[in-house]
Curated annotation (Swiss-Prot):
Protein name as it appears in the record: tRNA pseudouridine synthase A
PANTHER family to which the protein is assigned, alphabetical: PSEUDOURIDYLATE SYNTHASE, TRNA PSEUDOURIDINE SYNTHASE-LIKE 1
Domain of life: Bacteria
Originating organism: Borrelia turicatae (strain 91E135)
Enzyme Commission number: 5.4.99.12
Reactions catalysed, as given in the entry: uridine(38/39/40) in tRNA = pseudouridine(38/39/40) in tRNA
One of the GO biological process terms: tRNA pseudouridine synthesis
Function of the molecule: Formation of pseudouridine at positions 38, 39 and 40 in the anticodon stem and loop of transfer RNAs.
Active site (record annotation): 52 (nucleophile)
């Protein structure tokens, strides 16, 4: 029996998140169903992170044990041939038994897409958050800069998040303009449930209302969930990459 690491990508639009839920379509459920069909035995997968309902991934990492003797190239082809079109295996490789996708991860990168141009095709908003008012990217980046370092992110946590420590380290946070979109990129040690979406929602709200950028710092330092305001929609969030070095 060998342990396999898989890099996967998926469109989360039609799924109730990554983690298995009874009688609901999930990314984990779809992959485990396919692996069971191939190996003729139940296989449980472990992931680097559990994305929420509607969230997408370009570089999610999972691991699982496989008993059958098969070349990884053929295994990848077999899995992808049985998976639905909105979930794909990008690559497979063998790893040591001690490897844990979640606990061995050093950093994670997320991207959030904001559609900020009224002259757009309707489908461009399917996986982006449409904001009608022209956003000032310089003001947004002033707020993003306040995230760098180690902070207590209680303000941007969710009541249902049972994580003991709300302290997280952010290494990079930046808004970038790309055609009709403004893309928020953030790299951190790990993230709380709905944390990225809460951060984006507050920053956009401050910008739309033309409040002082320091308002964001006050909200961050308050450790008060009631100041979170609006949570940005899940459909525009992507897990881009998981770093292990």
């Amino acid at each position: 029996m060998k342990k396999v690491l898989a890099k996967i990508t998926y469109d989360g639009s039609l799924y109730y998140g990554f983690q298995i839920q009874p009688k609901k379509p999930t990314i984990q459920g779809e992959i485990e169903k396919v692996l069971e069909k191939i190996s003729k035995t139940k296989i449980k997968i472990h992931s680097a992170g559990r994305t929420d309902k509607g969230v997408h991934a370009r570089g999610q990492i999972i691991s699982f044990y496989i008993k059958i003797n098969i070349k990884l190239k053929n295994l990848k082809t077999a899995i992808n041939s049985l998976l639905k079109d909105d979930i794909r295996i990008i690559k497979l490789k063998y790893v040591e038994d001690k490897f844990q996708p979640r606990f061995d991860a050093k950093r994670r990168k997320y991207s959030y897409y904001i559609l900020n141009n009224e002259n757009h095709y309707p489908w461009e908003g399917y996986r982006a958050y449409y904001v009608k008012k022209k956003l000032n990217i310089n003001r947004l980046n002033e707020m993003a800069e306040m995230l760098i370092g180690i902070h207590d992110f209680t303000t941007f946590s969710c009541i249902r998040d049972q994580t003991n420590s709300k302290l997280k380290e952010i290494y990079y946070a930046r808004f970038k303009k790309k055609n009709k979109f403004i893309i928020f990129e953030i790299i951190g040690s790990s993230f709380l449930w709905k944390m990225v979406r809460s951060i984006v929602g507050v920053m956009i709200d401050i910008e739309i209302k033309n409040e002082p950028v320091d308002t964001f710092k006050k909200i961050l330092n308050s450790k008060n969930r009631k100041l979170t305001r609006k949570t940005a929609p899940a459909k525009a969030l992507f897990l881009d990459k998981v770093f292990y070095e």
